[in-house]
Amino acid sequence: MFQRLILILFFSVYGLMAKGQQNINSIDSFRLYGDVKITIDKPVNFSPNKKTIISFFALPNGNSTEQTMGKKMQTGDDWHFDIQHIRAQTKFIRQQLPKKNFVVIYLENNYKSWPAWKQKHPDFKNEIPHLVDSLAGLLEAKQKVIYLNGHSGGGSFIFGYLAGVEQIPSSVKRISFLDSDYGYDSSYYPKFKNWLQQVKGAALNVFAYNDSVALYNGKPVVSARGGTWYRSHLLLQHLQKDFSFSKTNTDSLIIYKSGNSQIQFYFKLNLNQGIYHTQQVELNGFIHSVLCGTKKDSKKYSYYSTRAYADLIK
């Protein structure tokens, strides 16, 4: 029933496609479950003959899809429009991957919080995987892979997906936590381990800053064990029992990579007790979450550096 409904919605959105791609906006939205907004950013030159990457991006708490996409700022604009720029970063990624279709599916809900949405949906363990599978099924391509990505509370969507599958399917090739793995605990580790060891091309990357010392108005932002710094290190500790890692340091980052770069962790130092939550996305974070460990890793951009996509912001 759900798949039938989603197909009806899809064809109502893309029903004009047969009349010519030149007349089709590459971004379209529709709603599911009554409280979920789906926005598909599909390249205008989409070809079913190209390998297709479908990147699900679960929105951070408190942000709309439009704010997450970003825009060129004008006087009076809300500051949220200038902190992620996923749309411009998507354009950059497409320039680096011209032989592939790179599709982004933004996932927003009425509560602007995936943890809150899951509380309202006790059957989320079934609903989230079904949502992902059904949306991926809408895109016709000879070869499709799924990336799961999210910032802040968006990580809760990813964990909801993981909780709902017995094992991570081989169609999922990349999981990225952009300062968003607050919900990690040891119960998820066996699924990560089996997926990384058994699925060819599986890649995991995690971004976090030392939020355990961050202050806002003189008060801690998170508890000592409640933030991504602690949760990311916990995941790393579990992985180190089964995978070997190298460690490197820069002026502001501690980086761990597995031997084949299949797994990567980026830890942002915090020497002034500041808040560096959104900067990890803004400073080429989405780009790096997609390209790190590939042949395009750090080509024409650097993570946590000047916006490589600045001229693509509209």
Regions found by a protein language model. Name each.
Residues 155-166:
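Short glycine-enriched nucleophile-adjacent loop
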Residues 1-21:
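Bacterial Sec-dependent N-terminal signal peptides
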Residues 87, 106-140:
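Alpha/beta-hydrolase active-site loop
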Residues 166-256:
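The feature captures the conserved acid-bearing segment of alpha/beta-hydrolase catalytic domains
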Residues 215-314:
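C-terminal accessory extensions appended to soluble enzyme cores
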Residues 140-152, 175:
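Alpha/beta-hydrolase fold nucleophile elbow
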Residues 32-37, 44-99:
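Short, surface-exposed "cap/lid" segments of acyl-processing enzymes
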Residues 20-44, 98-99, 138, 147, ...:
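Basic, amphipathic N-terminal segments that precede the first structured/catalytic domain
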